[in-house]
């Protein structure tokens, strides 16, 4: 499966974090950030549309995975770190899918707030190649689906206050901001202040 630039950047962030925390396996990390569902459609693009010069994608496979801060949570968990994860999802199928996949990975989801009447952000990527001609597919289109309005800052305040409860027991604070409302300047400043007071390393993934 082709890897886009956002995923490469997140992988590099995890590698740097693993290097920093290499001797702290089994420790807890506090993570605050935005989440989204990454959906990948794979298919063959053999023909052009009859009314516009765009490829017609014949989809044969669809994959989904937790993205953004949820992707970081999975990476931290995979290197032996307990993740105290704080974020929010919409009360919809996509939000439930994120929570279910994190639960299957053994990541605690008690810090994930479900927001009624709100859609979870979904990044939909379409990959295609010419059948029997190209082995490597390429991205043809990305479509983003989610809420049009920003969530109230009170949600970020709530997440930060919840994260504060276990922060002193963590070996690091990770903040992953995708400008979707889980992180604000005020909430990040509050958490970073407590982390510095307790000599806890802070890693930002803006």
Over which residues does each language-model region extend?
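Ribokinase/PfkB-type carbohydrate-kinase core domain
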Residues: 1-46, 58-206
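Flexible glycine/proline-rich, aromatic-decorated loop/lid segments
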Residues: 47-51
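Gly/Ser/Thr-rich active-site loops/lids in small-molecule metabolic enzymes
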Residues: 52-58
């Amino acid at each position: 499966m082709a890897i886009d630039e956002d995923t490469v950047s997140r992988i590099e962030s995890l590698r740097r974090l693993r290097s920093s925390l290499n001797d702290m396996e089994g420790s807890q990390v506090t993570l605050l950030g935005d989440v989204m569902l990454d959906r990948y459609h794979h298919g063959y693009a053999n023909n052009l549309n009859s009314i516009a010069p765009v490829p017609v994608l014949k989809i044969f496979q669809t994959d989904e995975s937790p993205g953004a801060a949820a992707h970081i949570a999975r990476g931290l968990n995979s290197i032996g770190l307990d993740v105290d994860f704080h974020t929010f999802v919409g009360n919809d199928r996509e939000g439930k899918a994120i929570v279910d996949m994190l639960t299957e990975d053994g990541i605690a989801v008690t810090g994930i707030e479900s927001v009624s009447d709100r859609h979870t952000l979904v990044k939909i990527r379409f990959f295609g190649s010419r059948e029997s001609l190209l082995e490597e597919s390429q991205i043809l289109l990305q479509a983003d689906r989610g809420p049009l309005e920003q969530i109230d800052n009170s949600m970020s305040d709530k997440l930060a206050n919840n994260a504060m409860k276990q922060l002193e027991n963590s070996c690091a604070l990770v903040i992953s901001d995708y400008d979707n409302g889980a992180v604000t300047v005020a909430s990040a400043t509050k958490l970073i202040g407590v982390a510095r007071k307790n000599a806890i390393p802070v890693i930002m993934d803006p």
